Regions:
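Conserved beta-strand positions in the central sheet of alpha/beta enzyme cores
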Residues: 17, 43-46, 123, 149
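Conserved, mostly hydrophobic/aromatic
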Residues: 18, 37, 45-48, 114, ...
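N-terminal small/glycine-rich loop or linker at the start of catalytic domains
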Residues: 3-24, 58-59, 64, 85-96
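Catalytic cores of alpha/beta
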Residues: 27-38, 110, 155-162
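Active-site mouth loops of central-metabolism enzymes
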Residues: 16-30, 94-106, 148-155
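A structural motif
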Residues: 39-42, 119
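Glycine/proline-rich, positively charged
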Residues: 95-127
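Active-site-adjacent beta->alpha loops and helix N-cap segments on the catalytic face
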Residues: 1-10, 52-61, 70-85, 102-108, ...
Length: 163
């Protein structure tokens, strides 16, 4: 069972999930940040994939992404930094990033590398739901990677049911 599903089956309330941008404030700190957060009792971690045009993010995350990119963070480097993370970290790990760098990496390769690295889920805020259902869902499910869709207060009841 995926670690996200396990977490929500064991603990249905008071789940603390923390987001941070990979490569910020330092390029080398990603894996150590994850380890410290788990030791401090965090239940799940969202790791931001820095992108040059983070249109859905606020100023703080935009600044962190810009600094991370200037520091040299790439998706390949992030996966390299996380390749041994599961030897020490047991909580669910979720990547959050825009579709462009994921497509440059190759969606199928991205999902395969997520599985091999121990990434449990991915949030892609600019992935249209229709495209996900028609093109990407089967690829992600084949690798046991959960694509987590976002909703807002304006999301229709019909769409929420589909998600």
């Amino acid at each position: 069972m995926n670690r996200i599903n396990q977490l929500f089956s064991i603990k249905q309330k008071d789940i603390l999930s923390i987001y941070f941008c990979a490569g910020f404030p330092t390029l080398e700190g990603t894996a150590s940040t994850i380890k410290v957060l788990e030791k401090k009792g965090i239940n799940m971690i969202e790791i931001g994939i820095p992108f040059s045009d983070p249109m859905a993010d606020g100023l703080v995350i935009q600044h962190a992404a810009t600094r991370a990119l200037k520091n040299g963070m790439t998706l390949k480097l992030l996966f390299d930094q996380l390749k041994d993370i599961r030897k020490e970290v047991q909580i669910p790990l979720v990547l959050m990033g825009y579709l462009n760098p994921i497509m440059q990496y190759g969606f199928k390769d991205f999902c395969r590398t997520c599985r091999e690295t121990g990434i449990d889920g991915v949030i892609i805020p600019d992935l249209p739901f229709k495209d996900y259902m028609e093109e990407y869902r089967s690829i992600a499910e084949e690798q046991d990677v959960r694509i987590i869709m976002l909703i807002t207060p304006e999301t229709s009841e019909e769409r929420i049911r589909l998600i």
